[in-house]
Amino acid sequence: MVADIERVGAEVVVCLGDTVQGGAQPAETLERLKALGCATVLGNADAFLLGEDVAEPTTPEQEQIRDWTVEQLGPSGMQRLRAFQPTAELELEGQKVLCCHGSPRSYDDILLPEDQTALDAWMVDADVLAGGHTHKQWTRRIGDALFVNPGSVGLAYDHHQPREAIRFQPVAEYALVFLDERGAAVEFRRIPYDVDELREAIRASGRPHADEHLRMYAT
């Protein structure tokens, strides 16, 4: 995905949070974000790593993975996580872009296409609102403004599947947002990656409950 971002010539990169919890290479991931020079907002999974209370119930297995991740990150990595802010506000091409994880109010909020009232409320003070959390690529215009959810880089899945049958797809999702004096437009990207290489990284990582995680990826 990073190669695709570089190929299309994106001028500004923003990460909408949930960066490393559950992944096989947490320290390497933070290093890659640093190399990209991108602003990163705080997601609920990042907050969980930092010991904050989050809305979604957690399991003993998730807590074991959290402890392992914290160990992998070390003090310097945890310091980087603590620097993540709930929102990032950018002024680009005369457009106000507000970036968050769930909503500008909370990383736990869920914004969906059918939630017109919530979307109307959050778009009041932005030309573009970018949010994640649901792992679902979608966009909607609200007057002259634009909401965009870029999907998920590492845990993309088919939202038509029952929750108990979810399998992650081997694609990295992101969105390109084009801005000029006329407004904003969006293009969704889905970049295939080598799932066998990912499986090897998970097996080699020492991550707790790796076998259960491997079963979540589509074959």
Name each model-derived stretch.
Residues I5-A10, E91-E93, W122-D125, L176, ...:
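Glycine-rich phosphate-binding loop signature in dinucleotide/nucleotide-binding domains
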Residues M1-M78:
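Core catalytic region of metal-dependent phosphoesterases/phosphodiesterases
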Residues P86-G94, R140-I142, V177:
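Short acidic-hydrophobic surface loop/beta-edge motif
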Residues P57-Q64, E93-V124, D158, E200:
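Active-site-proximal segments of metal-dependent phosphoesterases and phosphodiesterases across multiple
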Residues Q21-A24, A45-L50, R105-Y107, A130-R141, ...:
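Active-site environment of divalent metal-dependent phosphoester hydrolases
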Residues V13-V14, D18, L33, G43, ...:
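Divalent metal-coordination and catalytic microenvironments
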Residues E114-A156, P162:
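Anionic-ligand binding region
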Residues I142-T219:
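Acidic, His/Gly-rich catalytic cores of divalent-metal-dependent hydrolytic chemistry
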